[in-house]
Amino acid sequence: AATQKVLTDNGVAPYDSKEMNEALGLIKGLVDDGSIHPDTINISAPEARELFAQGQAAFLCQGMWCVSQWDANYPDLNYGVMAVPVPDGVTNTYVQAGELSPWMGIYKQSKHPKEAAEYLMALYDEQYGYQQSNVESGSFVSCIPEINEKYMTNEHMKQYYTIAEETSRVVPTLVKRDEKANDFYAEVKDVQPSLGAIVQGIISQSITDYDSALKTLANDTTTEWKRASEAVGMDYSSLEFPNWDATKDYTDADYETLK
């Protein structure tokens, strides 16, 4: 499950899948052979960017937001952008992409919805220049493809954008399928230790039996998702997308076939 993207596989939370175990096994291997920076657990994202820029790390798993920061603070930094690495011989691997949409919306109980709408229209209007300036500087990718195509001049951002287009696929989202999804997300409680906590445990070497930890997380999370679904009156089966092919974008037509 990603942020606001709870999905099930055959009715259960898929945290203990073969692929998840292999991913955590890879992380453990990197820890065991000394590949992971010893300060990884204790530093913030900005601090990690600094370590990379100062030559203390050869590879950094972060996002496009690093580009503008390095251009501003380390204009002579010689670096490149690459796709997420995969094991030798593995093909058809992709990263998830949300639907191309703005990151802000209007609160349904807003006292000034008209003014809010006008603000958002201006914010995403090419003439306003906000989208244009951020794309040109390499700060982020616009949700408007035409603006990206017209104003993306930063070479590192171009590399990122090309790789993202080739290696990402739109995944199904519960919010688009069920009107009670937001109520569900408001109700559901985090299960601990979370996946992030388990990964941190592997890196800090406080967790060695990650297989058992993943099984516990999957079982407890499934129980919690069922509880939250019942609490808000949402059909638990809405979390299952049996027609999802992870190698393809999930489309409106795919949602329609589930009705």
Language model region names:
Residues 53-63, 75-77:
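Alpha-to-beta junction loops
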Residues 45, 62-67, 85, 101-102:
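Beta->alpha turn/N-cap motifs
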Residues 1-13, 28, 57, 233-236:
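Extracytoplasmic/periplasmic solute-binding protein
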